[in-house]
A protein has these predicted regions:
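C-terminal catalytic/motor cores of large multi-domain enzyme assemblies
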Residues: 1-117
Length: 117
């Protein structure tokens, strides 16, 4: 198992080598899970297309200030972002994908310190 810090270091190396066009095809042509982050370009919603050989892809959009109603009926402005999971149901059971999104939402909404790299 890889912890979050090691994953961050590995990700940083992949990004660096990708930007310098040093990745080999086998490093980006297959995988079990892909993350597509167009949020860093200000895109606030999109659907990511599942690449062949991939079990699922998570589309992460930009966060935006949004007017929301509180549980008590109050009105507030909160930052919200859209994420969208596309999964190959031959590989990933839909209920597992839904549970993943629920856990991700809880992490983002209540435990933001877990997301810092």
């Amino acid at each position: 198992r890889t912890d979050l810090y090691e994953l961050s270091r590995q990700w940083g190396d992949l990004v660096k080598r990708s930007r310098s066009k040093q990745l080999q095809p086998e490093e980006y042509s297959t995988g079990t899970f892909t993350l597509s982050n167009l949020g860093m370009f200000g895109v606030d919603r999109f659907d990511a297309i599942l690449p062949p050989g991939t079990g699922a892809i998570l589309a992460v959009a930009a966060s935006r200030p949004t007017v929301v109603a509180g549980k008590d009926g109050s009105i507030a402005v909160k930052r919200q972002m859209q994420v969208n999971l596309t999964a190959d149901h031959r590989v990933i059971y839909g209920a597992d994908g839904a549970a993943f999104l629920k856990d991700l939402a809880e992490l983002i909404e209540t435990r933001t310190e877990s997301l810092a790299m």
